[in-house]
Amino acid sequence: ITHFDLANNYGPRPGAAEEAFGQILRSDFAGLRDELIISSKAGYYMWDGPYGEWGSRKYLIASCDQSLKRLGVDYVDIFYSHRFDPDTPLEETMAALDHIVRSGRALYVGLSSYNAQRTREAAAILRDLGTPCLIHQPSYNMLNRWVERDGLLDAMDDLGMGSIAFTALAQGMLTRRYLNGIPGDSRAAQGKS
Protein backbone atom coordinates (compact mmCIF):
# COMPACT_ATOMS: atom_id res chain seq x y z
CA ILE A 1 0.00 0.00 0.00
CA THR A 2 1.45 3.32 -1.06
CA HIS A 3 -1.64 5.55 -1.31
CA PHE A 4 -3.07 7.02 1.86
CA ASP A 5 -6.34 8.91 1.40
CA LEU A 6 -7.36 11.30 4.15
CA ALA A 7 -9.57 14.33 4.73
CA ASN A 8 -9.46 17.18 7.17
CA ASN A 9 -12.65 16.00 8.88
CA TYR A 10 -11.84 12.26 9.21
CA GLY A 11 -11.58 10.77 12.67
CA PRO A 12 -13.58 10.63 15.86
CA ARG A 13 -12.93 14.38 15.97
CA PRO A 14 -12.05 16.48 12.92
CA GLY A 15 -8.36 16.20 12.06
CA ALA A 16 -7.68 13.10 14.15
CA ALA A 17 -6.99 10.81 11.18
CA GLU A 18 -4.44 13.22 9.72
CA GLU A 19 -2.72 13.57 13.10
CA ALA A 20 -2.54 9.79 13.52
CA PHE A 21 -1.22 9.29 10.00
CA GLY A 22 1.34 12.07 10.54
CA GLN A 23 2.67 10.16 13.55
CA ILE A 24 2.81 6.91 11.56
CA LEU A 25 4.52 8.71 8.70
CA ARG A 26 7.25 9.98 11.04
CA SER A 27 7.74 6.67 12.87
CA ASP A 28 7.03 3.83 10.44
CA PHE A 29 7.51 5.51 7.06
CA ALA A 30 10.37 7.88 7.89
CA GLY A 31 12.43 8.45 4.77
CA LEU A 32 9.78 7.02 2.44
CA ARG A 33 7.77 10.17 1.65
CA ASP A 34 8.81 10.13 -2.00
CA GLU A 35 7.43 6.59 -2.35
CA LEU A 36 3.98 7.46 -1.01
CA ILE A 37 0.88 9.11 -2.44
CA ILE A 38 -0.81 11.15 0.28
CA SER A 39 -4.12 12.84 -0.45
CA SER A 40 -6.43 14.97 1.62
CA LYS A 41 -9.72 16.75 1.13
CA ALA A 42 -11.63 19.73 2.48
CA GLY A 43 -15.27 20.70 2.22
CA TYR A 44 -17.03 19.36 5.31
CA TYR A 45 -17.38 20.94 8.75
CA MET A 46 -14.14 21.69 10.60
CA TRP A 47 -14.79 24.69 12.85
CA ASP A 48 -17.52 27.15 13.83
CA GLY A 49 -17.99 30.29 11.82
CA PRO A 50 -18.74 31.26 8.25
CA TYR A 51 -15.47 29.84 6.88
CA GLY A 52 -15.48 26.50 8.70
CA GLU A 53 -16.77 24.33 5.85
CA TRP A 54 -17.78 24.17 2.17
CA GLY A 55 -15.75 25.62 -0.70
CA SER A 56 -14.66 29.20 -0.15
CA ARG A 57 -11.09 30.17 -1.00
CA LYS A 58 -10.47 31.08 2.65
CA TYR A 59 -11.71 27.71 3.93
CA LEU A 60 -9.91 25.55 1.37
CA ILE A 61 -6.52 27.24 1.75
CA ALA A 62 -6.76 27.34 5.56
CA SER A 63 -7.87 23.70 5.61
CA CYS A 64 -5.00 22.65 3.37
CA ASP A 65 -2.51 24.49 5.60
CA GLN A 66 -3.97 22.84 8.71
CA SER A 67 -3.86 19.42 7.03
CA LEU A 68 -0.19 19.87 6.12
CA LYS A 69 0.59 20.79 9.72
CA ARG A 70 -1.29 17.78 11.14
CA LEU A 71 0.40 15.46 8.64
CA GLY A 72 3.82 17.02 9.19
CA VAL A 73 4.50 17.32 5.46
CA ASP A 74 5.30 20.19 3.11
CA TYR A 75 2.80 19.10 0.46
CA VAL A 76 0.18 16.49 -0.36
CA ASP A 77 0.18 14.67 -3.66
CA ILE A 78 -3.53 15.27 -4.28
CA PHE A 79 -5.83 17.81 -2.66
CA TYR A 80 -9.57 17.42 -3.29
CA SER A 81 -12.59 19.67 -3.05
CA HIS A 82 -14.61 17.24 -0.92
CA ARG A 83 -18.03 18.39 -2.13
CA PHE A 84 -19.68 20.95 -4.37
CA ASP A 85 -20.61 24.17 -2.58
CA PRO A 86 -23.91 25.59 -3.90
CA ASP A 87 -23.28 28.97 -2.22
CA THR A 88 -19.75 29.69 -3.43
CA PRO A 89 -19.04 30.42 -7.10
CA LEU A 90 -17.39 27.39 -8.67
CA GLU A 91 -14.75 29.75 -10.07
CA GLU A 92 -13.71 30.70 -6.51
CA THR A 93 -13.45 27.08 -5.39
CA MET A 94 -11.42 26.06 -8.43
CA ALA A 95 -9.19 29.16 -8.16
CA ALA A 96 -8.42 28.10 -4.58
CA LEU A 97 -7.41 24.62 -5.79
CA ASP A 98 -5.27 26.20 -8.50
CA HIS A 99 -3.60 28.41 -5.86
CA ILE A 100 -2.94 25.38 -3.65
CA VAL A 101 -1.04 23.72 -6.51
CA ARG A 102 0.80 26.86 -7.62
CA SER A 103 1.90 27.57 -4.05
CA GLY A 104 3.40 24.08 -3.70
CA ARG A 105 0.90 22.77 -1.15
CA ALA A 106 -0.29 20.02 -3.53
CA LEU A 107 1.00 18.45 -6.71
CA TYR A 108 -2.44 17.74 -8.17
CA VAL A 109 -6.09 18.51 -7.48
CA GLY A 110 -9.23 16.44 -7.59
CA LEU A 111 -12.95 16.52 -6.92
CA SER A 112 -15.12 14.36 -4.71
CA SER A 113 -18.87 13.84 -4.95
CA TYR A 114 -19.43 16.37 -7.76
CA ASN A 115 -22.05 15.36 -10.32
CA ALA A 116 -21.23 15.08 -14.02
CA GLN A 117 -22.30 18.62 -14.94
CA ARG A 118 -20.36 20.24 -12.09
CA THR A 119 -17.35 18.03 -12.82
CA ARG A 120 -17.27 19.21 -16.43
CA GLU A 121 -17.63 22.84 -15.34
CA ALA A 122 -14.94 22.54 -12.66
CA ALA A 123 -12.52 20.77 -15.01
CA ALA A 124 -12.99 23.50 -17.64
CA ILE A 125 -12.26 26.24 -15.09
CA LEU A 126 -9.16 24.43 -13.86
CA ARG A 127 -7.99 23.79 -17.43
CA ASP A 128 -8.32 27.50 -18.21
CA LEU A 129 -6.28 28.27 -15.09
CA GLY A 130 -3.59 25.83 -16.22
CA THR A 131 -4.11 23.26 -13.45
CA PRO A 132 -5.62 20.01 -14.72
CA CYS A 133 -8.13 18.13 -12.62
CA LEU A 134 -6.47 14.76 -12.22
CA ILE A 135 -9.01 12.62 -10.42
CA HIS A 136 -12.53 12.30 -9.06
CA GLN A 137 -13.54 10.42 -5.92
CA PRO A 138 -17.23 9.47 -6.05
CA SER A 139 -19.13 6.99 -3.91
CA TYR A 140 -19.62 3.92 -6.08
CA ASN A 141 -20.50 0.30 -5.42
CA MET A 142 -22.96 -2.39 -6.47
CA LEU A 143 -25.72 -0.82 -4.35
CA ASN A 144 -24.96 2.79 -5.25
CA ARG A 145 -24.50 3.28 -8.98
CA TRP A 146 -25.42 6.95 -9.29
CA VAL A 147 -22.23 7.68 -11.25
CA GLU A 148 -23.57 5.57 -14.12
CA ARG A 149 -27.04 7.18 -14.18
CA ASP A 150 -25.64 10.69 -13.75
CA GLY A 151 -23.13 10.32 -16.58
CA LEU A 152 -20.16 10.96 -14.30
CA LEU A 153 -18.23 7.96 -15.63
CA ASP A 154 -18.64 9.27 -19.17
CA ALA A 155 -17.65 12.78 -18.09
CA MET A 156 -14.48 11.49 -16.42
CA ASP A 157 -13.65 9.45 -19.51
CA ASP A 158 -14.19 12.45 -21.80
CA LEU A 159 -12.01 14.61 -19.55
CA GLY A 160 -9.24 12.03 -19.16
CA MET A 161 -9.85 12.08 -15.42
CA GLY A 162 -9.13 9.09 -13.21
CA SER A 163 -11.46 7.75 -10.55
CA ILE A 164 -10.88 6.34 -7.10
CA ALA A 165 -14.21 5.24 -5.62
CA PHE A 166 -15.08 5.39 -1.95
CA THR A 167 -17.54 3.16 -0.08
CA ALA A 168 -16.69 0.29 -2.41
CA LEU A 169 -18.18 -2.10 0.18
CA ALA A 170 -21.28 0.08 0.74
CA GLN A 171 -20.37 0.98 4.34
CA GLY A 172 -20.12 -2.75 5.12
CA MET A 173 -23.38 -3.81 3.46
CA LEU A 174 -21.38 -5.91 0.97
CA THR A 175 -19.50 -7.76 3.73
CA ARG A 176 -20.41 -10.67 5.99
CA ARG A 177 -21.32 -8.31 8.80
CA TYR A 178 -24.91 -7.92 7.59
CA LEU A 179 -25.68 -11.53 6.58
CA ASN A 180 -27.79 -12.17 9.69
CA GLY A 181 -29.50 -8.80 9.97
CA ILE A 182 -28.38 -5.37 11.08
CA PRO A 183 -25.95 -5.44 14.03
CA GLY A 184 -26.93 -3.04 16.82
CA ASP A 185 -23.55 -1.29 16.79
CA SER A 186 -23.48 -0.76 13.02
CA ARG A 187 -23.71 2.51 11.12
CA ALA A 188 -26.96 1.25 9.56
CA ALA A 189 -28.54 0.71 13.00
CA GLN A 190 -27.52 4.23 14.01
CA GLY A 191 -29.15 5.70 10.90
CA LYS A 192 -25.82 6.69 9.35
CA SER A 193 -24.99 6.11 5.71
Regions found by a protein language model. Give the residues of each.
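N-terminal binding-site loop/beta-alpha segment at the start of enzyme catalytic domains
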Residues: 1-36, 40, 102
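Glycine-centered flexible beta-alpha turn that most often forms the glycine-rich phosphate-binding loop
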Residues: 4, 76, 109
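Short amphipathic alpha-helices and their capping/turn segments at secondary-structure boundaries
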Residues: 18-32, 64-69, 151-160
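Acidic (Asp/Glu)-rich catalytic clusters
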Residues: 24-37, 68-72, 98-102, 123-130
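A short, structured active-site edge motif that brings together acidic residues
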Residues: 33-46, 137-140
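Active-site mouth loops of central-metabolism enzymes
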Residues: 45-61, 82-88
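Active-site groove signature of glycoside hydrolases
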Residues: 68-88
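Beta/alpha (TIM)-barrel catalytic core signal, keyed to glycine-rich beta->alpha loops juxtaposed to Asp/Glu
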Residues: 84-193
